[in-house]
From Swiss-Prot:
Its cofactor is Mg(2+). Keywords: Cytoplasm, DNA damage, DNA recombination, DNA repair, DNA-binding, Endonuclease, Hydrolase, Magnesium, Metal-binding, Nuclease. It is found in: Cytoplasm. It comes from Dinoroseobacter shibae (strain DSM 16493 / NCIMB 14021 / DFL 12). The keyword Metal-binding applies. The keyword DNA-binding applies. This is Crossover junction endodeoxyribonuclease RuvC. Pfam families: RuvC. Its EC number is 3.1.21.10. Homodimer which binds Holliday junction (HJ) DNA. The HJ becomes 2-fold symmetrical on binding to RuvC with unstacked arms; it has a different conformation from HJ DNA in complex with RuvA. In the full resolvosome a probable DNA-RuvA(4)-RuvB(12)-RuvC(2) complex forms which resolves the HJ. One of its GO terms (biological process) is DNA recombination.
Amino acid sequence: MRVLGIDPGLRNLGWGVISVQGSRLRHVANGQIRSEGSELAQRLLSLYRQLTEVVAGHAPDAAAVEHTFVNKDATGTLKLGQARGIALLVPAAAGLEVAEYAPNHVKKSVVGVGHAAKEQVQHMVKLQLPGVVLAGADAADALAIAICHAHHLQSRGKVVAVNRTVAAPDGLRSVS
């Protein structure tokens, strides 16, 4: 089973794909999408197109997106919310179930502490995905979101069920 994690951002959107087989996690790919254009509509379209390419290219089975927090800059929060809408829309349009997690939940799941620093998150992502080369901080966060969702799916027994379905002899694709 492949899980796509997305760390939404208007200028930089982080993404990461991991493969989950039982309790084993393996890095597939990660990157950062930089929006193009100066107008909001152009940036959102750029995010949409590039994220659609990521989903098509890596064929995830599930997706997870980080919740955004509200800050004092209402305009900035609204713009980030619009980028988050793209992050939710693209995998949903591809037929994926999309989960959402609060930043503190992701950190607690990956690091063990809900208020972990970015450096701690990056360190734990590297430990859980040996050999990974991070494309940047946003990509590391996206991989952490994917790991968090994988842990959630494992606790619900969904990984085993999906792995059986995908590896079934009736012609469905095999999971790597």
